[in-house]
Amino acid sequence: MSTAPKAPDFLVVIPARLGSTRLPRKPLADIGGKPMVVRVAERAKQSLAHSVIVATDSPEIQAACDEHRIECLLTSPDHPTGTDRIAEVAQLLKLPSNALVVNVQGDEPLIPPELINQVAQTLAEHPQCAISTVAVLISEPSEIDNSNVVKVVLNREGEALYFSRAPIPYVRDPQELIKTEHLRHLGIYAYRADFLQAYTRLDPAPPEQAEALEQLRALWNGYRIAVHTAPEAPPAGVDTLDDLERVRQLLGNT
């Protein structure tokens, strides 16, 4: 009799800062009486993670987490990316090199816990990879040419060849468009702890700077990224006031 694979041991880190440009003070936005970052942490706690930690440079966010009994670490205000902030957490916790760390964005209060489990499982099943992430098939043709929708092309092993805001793969013959799959990248990652420490020492890569996609730094330096193709897209995160109102209506006073 076959048995299901053992769930990997992992922790979730939620990077959160107040300096959002489109929606000021976004992590502290109220959703049914709780700050958004707390809502995200509560969703993450429904996953199989052994711990969930908010990483922030804001004493206000730390105080909000303390009030709701969410573990929080105060980190440096100088980190250029959320990945750098997570690397500091891995260092502060003295994580072993093979520890798995899942990065959940602080503006995803509706993230399915199963998706968090899946990105960790994907990395555990790909020992040759330093990172795992998630993609979903694009069903709306307009998204293919939308530069705000990041596309990814995979190899036959389910690893990322490239991420781009451009329409990749580019379909030269319009007759081939209907049978060409395009994948949308979703911004959830799992990392090995030793990669996180290496990442902080890597210089920004030319394609990363051109596309404004930090995952290209890993590919540029030869690190491999495993990609799970999800059967459907999760609920969208919160980028605008309209998004926030939508989530407030969905969660209400839960």
UniProtKB/Swiss-Prot annotation:
Pathway: Nucleotide-sugar biosynthesis; CMP-3-deoxy-D-manno-octulosonate biosynthesis; CMP-3-deoxy-D-manno-octulosonate from 3-deoxy-D-manno-octulosonate and CTP: step 1/1; Bacterial outer membrane biogenesis; lipopolysaccharide biosynthesis. GO terms for cellular component: cytosol. This is 3-deoxy-manno-octulosonate cytidylyltransferase. It comes from Polynucleobacter asymbioticus (strain DSM 18221 / CIP 109841 / QLW-P1DMWA-1) (Polynucleobacter necessarius subsp. asymbioticus). It catalyses: 3-deoxy-alpha-D-manno-oct-2-ulosonate + CTP = CMP-3-deoxy-beta-D-manno-octulosonate + diphosphate. The keyword Transferase applies. It is found in: Cytoplasm. GO terms for molecular function: 3-deoxy-manno-octulosonate cytidylyltransferase activity. The lineage of its organism: Bacteria, Pseudomonadati, Pseudomonadota, Betaproteobacteria, Burkholderiales. Its EC number is 2.7.7.38. Belongs to the KdsB family.
